[in-house]
Amino acid sequence: MIFDTHAHYDDKKFDADRREVLAAMPAKGVSLIVDPGCDGESSRTACALAQEFPFVYAAVGWHPEEWQSWNGESMALLRSLCAQPKVVAIGEIGLDYYWDTEHKALQKEMFERQLSLAIERKLPVIVHDREAHGDCLEIVMNYPEARGVFHCFSGSAEMAKELIRRGWYLGFDGPVTYKSNKKAAEVLAVTPLERILVETDSPYMAPEPCRGKRNDSSLLVYVLEKIAALKGVSAEEMTRITQENGCRLFGIEA
C-alpha cells in the first residue's frame, strides 16, 4: 500500500470534493497520507482531516512563502497544534528564495524557531527548500538534533550525500517523471533505498502522464514506477520500502 508523505488536501483546489477524494484513496491503494500545514489556518485544517480520516496524519508549520501572516502568536499556535493527536511532524517549513529574496532574514528566523520547536517536541520536520540550498543546509547543520525529510528534493547529488550522512530522508514526487529532469536520476543514484520517501505535493506537480492536471495521492503509482526503474527494483518492492521508511520517520504503525 502507498504512503503519500506530503499532500495538501487542505488546499482550496480540493474545496469542491475534498472528502470524496480522500474517502476513495484506500480503494486506490493508498494506505497513509501526511498533510502538512503552511500557516495557522491550513495547519488547523490538516489536524481536522487527520481526525476525520483514519489514514490521514497531520504536520503543522509555517511555510516560508507565508511570512506575511507570521506574527507574535504563531509559535504559540503551533505549540498548541503539535500537541494534538495524529500530528507527526513540524512542517512545511524552510526557505524559498524563488519568489522572495527580500525577506531572507525573516524566513531564516521562522525556519530556526520551528526547528527548535521540533527538537523540543521530538518531532521530525518537513523541509521546503527552493533556490535556497546553501542556506537550508547550513541551518540544518546548525541543528544536529533535527531530523526529517527534504521535501521535493531539488539539490545536488553532493548535497544529498551530506544530508543522508546526517540521517535525513529525501522526498521525491512528480518531477521525477519529467523527461527534462536529469538531476533526479543523479540524486537517486546516491540515495540508499532506506532514505527515499515518495510524495505528491497534491494538488500540485502531477506526474507524467497526468502533468498539468490536479494531482492526488493515487497518481503516486507513476512516481513509484519511475523510482523503482532507476533503482533496479520492482514497483511493489519500492512501494513497500517507502511505506516502511515513512512509518519509521513519522512514528506511524502501518
Annotate each language-model stretch with its function.
Residues M1-A254:
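Mid-domain alpha/beta scaffold segments of enzyme catalytic cores
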